[in-house]
């Protein structure tokens, strides 16, 4: 609209509802693409690499550092264990147990 006052010429009414648009996609992936993605995921999980872990001693709360070599899946398992009931002991506290 232009100007200070509206006129009937400037008002546009749409009496018909808009056409519905289908939102479903009919495209399908080839099974070979799925297999390539799955193999790439497995390959990255099977590669072992070193991980440095810094945690605290379960007895005296000193900082403990260790390095492990494992796969990505295994480091996630270790992370879950460390968040649970698994405690790492420092060299000072280990002989006392």
Curated annotation (Swiss-Prot):
GO terms for biological process: DNA-templated transcription; symbiont-mediated perturbation of host cell cycle G1/S transition checkpoint; symbiont-mediated suppression of host innate immune response; symbiont-mediated suppression of host type I interferon-mediated signaling pathway. It is found in: Host cytoplasm; Host nucleus. One of its GO terms (cellular component) is host cell nucleus. Highly phosphorylated. GO terms for molecular function: DNA binding; DNA-binding transcription factor activity; protein domain specific binding; zinc ion binding. A motif (LXCXE motif) lies at residues 23-27. A motif (Nuclear export signal) lies at residues 75-83. SUPFAM superfamilies: E7 C-terminal domain-like. Residues 1-41 are annotated as: E7 terminal domain. Coiled coil: none annotated. Pfam families: E7 (PF00527). A zinc finger (unnamed) spans 57-93. Signal peptide: none annotated. Keywords: Activator, DNA-binding, Early protein, G1/S host cell cycle checkpoint dysregulation by virus, Host cytoplasm, Host nucleus, Host-virus interaction, Inhibition of host innate immune response by virus, Inhibition of host interferon signaling pathway by virus, Interferon antiviral system evasion, Metal-binding, Modulation of host cell cycle by virus, Oncogene, Transcription, Transcription regulation, Viral immunoevasion, Zinc, Zinc-finger. Its main location: host cell. Disulfide bonds: none annotated. Homodimer. Homooligomer. Interacts with host RB1; this interaction induces dissociation of RB1-E2F1 complex thereby disrupting RB1 activity. Interacts with host EP300; this interaction represses EP300 transcriptional activity. Interacts with protein E2; this interaction inhibits E7 oncogenic activity. Interacts with host TMEM173/STING; this interaction impairs the ability of TMEM173/STING to sense cytosolic DNA and promote the production of type I interferon (IFN-alpha and IFN-beta). The E7 terminal domain is an intrinsically disordered domain, whose flexibility and conformational transitions confer target adaptability to the oncoprotein. It allows adaptation to a variety of protein targets and exposes the PEST degradation sequence that regulates its turnover in the cell. Plays a role in viral genome replication by driving entry of quiescent cells into the cell cycle. Stimulation of progression from G1 to S phase allows the virus to efficiently use the cellular DNA replicating machinery to achieve viral genome replication. E7 protein has both transforming and trans-activating activities. Induces the disassembly of the E2F1 transcription factor from RB1, with subsequent transcriptional activation of E2F1-regulated S-phase genes. Interferes with host histone deacetylation mediated by HDAC1 and HDAC2, leading to transcription activation. Belongs to the papillomaviridae E7 protein family. This is Protein E7. It comes from Human papillomavirus 44. The gene is E7.
């Amino acid at each position: 609209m232009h100007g200070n006052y509206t006129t009937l010429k400037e008002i546009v009414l749409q009496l018909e509802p808009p056409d519905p648009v289908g939102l479903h996609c009919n495209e399908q992936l080839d099974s070979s693409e799925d297999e390539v993605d799955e193999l790439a995921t497995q390959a990255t999980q099977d590669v072992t690499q070193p991980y440095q872990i810094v945690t605290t001693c379960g007895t005296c709360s000193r900082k403990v550092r260790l390095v492990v070599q494992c796969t990505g899946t295994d480091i996630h398992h270790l992370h879950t264990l460390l968040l649970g009931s698994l405690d790492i002991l420092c060299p000072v506290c280990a002989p006392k147990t």
